[in-house]
């Protein structure tokens, strides 16, 4: 989108209002502003703001007060940063160009399949900031009601790759992994990266923040080391240490994905086609050639049946093959959380316990890591078929994984210990018996109500596993919160929902 300030359109003086609106550009104008009247600009309409050769499309709000003087316009942080202006600079306001790709969204709402050019236009306009949250919600909802077919998924993946930057590596094999999610804990990625890099593989891992879970890999890793790496820094870290764990949103790799994720989080949806396009577009952009996908299967996991898992694996493999990727899917146990911690800092403590070979390190996390890392080592050609799990365990027990992890953290900006919550409350068993069911979804919801992932120290520390014998009054879990209000909110939820851990005599 190109435009320049012209003498024909009156200019307004820019005022920085320091409003944070989740990356959404917002502007405030007076209701009696001559530009609003001349251009016919209505409240909550989209407007184009021009400053020199820079532009940004923003949501307009109008005010009837002296907060703004005549001839002024106030901009949110997102709009201010996009224009790169200074206090008092002159800007112009116009109607934005017609959003032609929106017709394809309307067609998709009515059940029409989208072609390559239509999806490319939608993704380009999304990245250019031309889609409102309402329009984004319409597109994502349309692809949830009538799921993307194979060709649409391939086209969307390609479109998401094409609008971003790409990393290229000298190594012929570049490995990566992804977990489909829906399972609390299961923080294998930092460990798998350390194991892979310690064995000579290249693994530039870019991870996301939480969408609907209490913690994403980037949230957890951020409690241990900086993750906001730019492309140059990421490249230097990987060239030096062989691997990294960085937040993908800090770079321009598949930038549409970060925008889609923000809306998906608010809608609390995560559809198969979008999931595949999200995962593979980021892997392709990061330069991966060989990928392991962990698909936990369980009644309260994201994937609830083996049939659904096989369907997802088939579609992942088909889309991956169309881009020349080598992909292996693992079906893993999704009946209960992996590790004890649920929430960024608590999951990080589990990671450290395994890396440091601590006596009380969660064995299930160690075993899950060995399974996933073993597949990565075999796929990457540094372990023979069937020997990957043994090599992964040896890399941990020998201390090589811990040494490599510390070096990666140092290269990313320095290692730090994860924070501790200010408030901790036990949740006690109300009866004696055996733990026969753990509701993953209720656990995740509870951890989020306690403040995770926004409060990194918040979450849950689980004390029981399926099959454990429990006595009345025993701690089933510890609830961690950073504020008394969040703790009270979470405890009220526990009171309302009944058993999270089902105990039978």
UniProtKB/Swiss-Prot annotation:
Q: Which GO terms describe its biological process?
A: pyrimidine nucleobase metabolic process; pyrimidine nucleoside metabolic process
Q: Which Pfam families match?
A: Glycos_trans_3N, Glycos_transf_3, PYNP_C
| Any one annotated GO CC term | cytosol
Reactions catalysed? thymidine + phosphate = 2-deoxy-alpha-D-ribose 1-phosphate + thymine
Q: Name the UniProt key words of this record, in alphabetical order.
A: Glycosyltransferase, Transferase
**One annotated GO molecular function:** 1,4-alpha-oligoglucan phosphorylase activity
Spell out the SMART domains in the cross-references.
Answer: PYNP_C (SM00941)
InterPro entries for the chain = Glycosyl_Trfase_fam3 (IPR000312), Glycosyl_Trfase_fam3_N_dom (IPR017459), Glycosyl_Trfase_fam3_N_dom_sf (IPR036320), Nuc_phospho_transferase (IPR035902), PYNP-like_C_sf (IPR036566), PYNP_C (IPR013102), Pyrmidine_PPase_CS (IPR017872), Thym_Pase_Put (IPR028579)
Q: Tell me its EC number(s), please.
A: 2.4.2.4
Entry superkingdom: Bacteria
Q: Which family does it belong to?
A: Belongs to the thymidine/pyrimidine-nucleoside phosphorylase family. Type 2 subfamily.
Q: What is this protein called?
A: Putative thymidine phosphorylase
Organism of provenance: Parvibaculum lavamentivorans (strain DS-1 / DSM 13023 / NCIMB 13966)
Q: What is the lineage of its organism?
A: Bacteria, Pseudomonadati, Pseudomonadota, Alphaproteobacteria, Hyphomicrobiales
